[in-house]
């Protein structure tokens, strides 16, 4: 009976320690790095300066300033959209096809090979443009290829054009 209580107490203690470490890690408190908000003399500007850089900020800071200044407004909008959602492969392929040079994207490898990168001029497709980013937005409901935006964003190209079934829409 004593061994059972000892084992149970050790297991409970282990669970508490693991939860405490997970909590500290989620708050960024590992290695003695406490949040500056706990002291009453800290200002919001100093706490913003002490925040760690996110992956998006690191990627943006890794781009050379000359590279950012040479981008067109539509290319900057595409880069901002890629930084918001790096898993969108359409945006990533357009971004890589527009600038296949290694010096503009030093973190990316040069192993990207696409049929779209054959030197064509950079044109941001209208369905990727955000109207709030002052790049013109979408002028009409149909795209340059004659399809509507809903058809362009559809997963399956062979389905009907009507949206009678809500499961056909992209969430």
Swiss-Prot record:
Chain positions found as Asparagine amide: 31
InterPro entries in alphabetical order: Procorazonin
Positions of the propeptide removed during maturation: 82-171
Signal peptide feature range: 1-20
GO biological process: neuropeptide signaling pathway; positive regulation of heart contraction
Modified residues (Pyrrolidone carboxylic acid): 21
GO molecular function, one term: neuropeptide hormone activity
GO cellular component, one term: extracellular region
Keyword terms, alphabetized: Amidation, Cleavage on pair of basic residues, Neuropeptide, Pyrrolidone carboxylic acid, Secreted, Signal
Superkingdom of this protein's organism: Eukaryota
Keyword rRNA-binding applies: no
Positions of disulphide bridges: none
Family: Belongs to the corazonin family.
Function: Cardioactive peptide. Corazonin is probably involved in the physiological regulation of the heart beat.
Protein name: Pro-corazonin
Species whose genome carries this gene: Anopheles gambiae
